[in-house]
């Protein structure tokens, strides 16, 4: 059964409730364990996933800006795990990178995470131990940090986009983790696309209702190309960080793995029809989320939204920036003949036999060893990322946000994950305001597992 057939089998899905929300309690836990969920239509049976508290995606964690997030993570899996709080400017020891900022949480053990959420916005949490497998099996969820004052919207909807590689004969997740093709090409791409764990998610709305849509790409490697239909929208934040002015959605927009986009949309579709967040895939389009218009809103159309309140930031000083170069090499059709690994030069054949296909600056990446850069606290650094591979890469920096620089070298979007197209060179700039050893890696998670990672040390 191909993806089209699998999607068609679910086309009659009914409207479903929102993902579960966990209001922050005094001593809450987060338990990683196997679970069975109805991921596919019922005729296919249930799918075994690895999940937090038995659901995938995991419960939404929601706090106010400046509040603490406390979770005791209990590992009831048969393998080690950890939890990374993606996009949070966090204390290094709470970052959740197994083998770098903490030991992995062994089976039967637990670990207490306790940190402040300094920035309002849309974030997420996910496993950071063999993440190319554990995230794909379902170990992730939304982390929402609310602004001090409510935003002028009628509803706030969190939409976790994902894809799953499913064997339709068994309804189980394909166990082909670490497959050579995934490691060396575009990554592990699923054949079943969901929102909040459901295909063809539908929600009831009123015409002229104003919604805040928080889109999170939790997939291993899929780049979502999206559009709006029957909705008038404005992008108000990237990766949790507000834009200085809302940007009207004129055409399509892209959401790479690990990225988030906050939209404010007005429902313009007629009563009895539906507005859609549309996924464009090659020459086809699908409804990612449908907003079924059941009646008129009690409110009239409003003017364009105001910008969200900004999060605190020290702007990069580009006149005194330290320049760091990062050249990405390797992969299928990349032409790389070899790279340094473990302190010695290895041929491409030897690299492939060890499951490594990619290199940064001629070295197979790792969390230990020499960092890509050592930067003083408060120093501005400008990272020049050159993609000499045949594939795009979503590059994520832990512990801090950065500005993408435009072609004129001016500060652009403030993000934690940037998409670098094949053959593209992109510059980003950040203020190293958070001390620690911070991972920099491709969030096509199979790529990170096969060489695409480095470290930036802030001292």
Placement of each model-derived feature along the sequence:
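N-terminal export signals
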Residues: 5-23
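Extended terminal and domain-junction accessory segments
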Residues: 17, 22-33, 135-167, 243-382, ...
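A long-range scaffold signal marking pre-active-site subdomains of enzyme folds
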Residues: 22-88
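Extracytoplasmic beta-sandwich strand-turn segments characteristic of Greek-key/jelly-roll folds
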Residues: 56, 61-63, 87-119, 199-201, ...
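Short, hydrophobic/aromatic beta-strand segments
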Residues: 81-86, 222-228, 394-397
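Histidine- and aromatic-rich segments of cupredoxin/plastocyanin-like copper-binding domains
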Residues: 94-95, 103-107, 176-320, 408-416
């Amino acid at each position: 059964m191909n993806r089209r057939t699998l999607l068609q089998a679910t086309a009659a899905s009914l409207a479903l409730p929102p993902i579960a929300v966990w209001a922050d309690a005094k001593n809450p836990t987060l338990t990683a364990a196997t679970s069975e969920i109805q991921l596919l239509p019922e005729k296919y049976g249930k799918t075994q996933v690895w999940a937090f508290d038995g659901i995938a995606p995991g419960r939404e964690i929601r706090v106010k800006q400046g509040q603490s997030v406390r979770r005791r993570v209990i590992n009831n899996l048969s393998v080690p795990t950890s939890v990374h709080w993606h996009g949070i400017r966090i204390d290094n020891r709470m970052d959740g990178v197994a083998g770098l900022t903490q030991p992995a949480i062994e089976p039967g053990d637990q670990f207490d995470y306790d940190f402040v959420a300094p920035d309002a916005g849309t974030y997420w949490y996910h496993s950071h131990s063999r993440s190319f497998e554990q995230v794909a099996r379902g170990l992730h969820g939304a982390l929402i940090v609310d602004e001090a004052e409510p935003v002028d919207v009628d509803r706030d909807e969190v939409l976790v986009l994902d894809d799953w590689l499913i064997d339709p004969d068994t309804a189980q997740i394909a166990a082909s983790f670490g497959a050579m093709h995934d490691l060396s090409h575009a990554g592990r791409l699923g054949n079943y696309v969901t929102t909040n764990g459901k295909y063809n998610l539908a929600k009831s709305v009123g015409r002229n209702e104003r919604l805040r849509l928080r889109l999170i790409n939790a997939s291993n490697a899929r780049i979502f190309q999206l559009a709006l239909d029957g909705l008038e929208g404005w992008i108000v934040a990237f990766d949790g960080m507000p834009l200085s002015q809302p940007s009207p959605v004129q055409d399509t927009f892209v959401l790479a793995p690990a990225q988030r986009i906050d939209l404010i949309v007005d429902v313009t579709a007629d009563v009895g029809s539906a507005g859609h967040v549309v996924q464009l895939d090659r020459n086809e389009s699908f409804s990612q989320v449908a907003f079924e218009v059941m009646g008129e809103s009690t409110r009239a159309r409003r003017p364009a939204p105001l910008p969200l309140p900004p999060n605190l930031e020290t702007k990069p000083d580009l006149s005194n920036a330290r320049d760091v170069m990062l050249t990405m090499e390797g992969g299928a059709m990349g032409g790389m003949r070899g790279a340094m690994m473990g302190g010695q030069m290895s041929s491409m054949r030897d690299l492939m036999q060890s499951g490594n296909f990619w290199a940064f600056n001629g070295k197979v990446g790792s969390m230990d060893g020499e960092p890509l850069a050592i930067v003083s606290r408060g120093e501005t650094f400008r990272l020049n990322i050159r993609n000499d591979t045949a594939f795009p890469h979503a590059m994520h920096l832990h512990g801090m946000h950065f500005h993408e620089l435009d072609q004129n070298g001016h500060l652009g979007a403030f993000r934690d994950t940037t998409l670098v197209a094949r053959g593209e060179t992109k510059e980003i700039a950040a203020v190293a305001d958070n001390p620690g050893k911070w991972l920099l890696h491709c969030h096509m998670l199979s790529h990170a597992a096969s060489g695409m990672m480095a470290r930036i040390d802030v001292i």
